[in-house]
Curated annotation (Swiss-Prot):
This is Gamma-glutamylaminecyclotransferase. Gene3D superfamilies: Gamma-glutamyl cyclotransferase-like. Signal peptide: none annotated. Residues 132-153 have a biased composition (Basic and acidic residues). PANTHER family: GAMMA-GLUTAMYLAMINECYCLOTRANSFERASE, TROPONIN C-AKIN-1 PROTEIN. Residues 130-153 are annotated as: Disordered.
Length: 153
């Protein structure tokens, strides 16, 4: 099993979360909420208001999201779903696990940091780096930039 950090439309309550729950794609089990240990720019950009984590470590904000344990089949599905490597790149980053853990999960004695895969954007229009940086994402958030799901495009 691999750990994947999701920060946008794949989180619980967001438009694409259903793909993580679909067993036909493989297995994905929620482990905990998490926060990046290093700042990154999380921006909302493009005509479909997509949340992008720009691969600019050290700039932006600490980003909150969710950590999932996924099997190889789900990881391959997510690569395809995220158009990796053409659009997103799957990289590794360190995430601090937060208090909201899965039922039955062991409580660590102290804050725990784990390495996770994340889908981020290494190449992007330069102006994206100047967009407002967010520390968390919600499609219905106060930013007013509602995500346009693939099925509506």
């Amino acid at each position: 099993m691999a750990l994947v950090f999701v920060y946008g439309t794949l989180k619980r309550g967001q438009p694409n979360h259903r793909v993580l729950r679909d067993g036909a794609h493989g297995s994905a089990a929620f482990r905990a909420r998490g926060r990046t240990l290093e700042p990154y720019p999380l921006v909302i950009a493009g005509e479909h208001n997509i949340p992008w984590l720009l691969h600019l470590p050290g700039s932006g904000r600490l980003v909150e999201g969710e950590v999932y344990a996924v099997d190889e089949r789900m990881l391959r599905f997510l690569d395809d779903f995220e158009s990796c490597p053409a659009l997103y790149q799957r990289t590794v980053l360190r995430v601090q696990l937060l208090e909201d853990r899965a039922p039955g999960a062991e409580e660590p004695p102290a804050p725990t940091a784990v390495q996770c895969f994340v889908y981020s954007r290494a190449t992007f229009p330069p102006e994206w780096a100047q967009l407002p940086h967010h520390d968390s994402y919600d499609s219905e958030g106060p930013h007013g930039l509602r995500y346009n799901p693939r099925e509506n495009r």
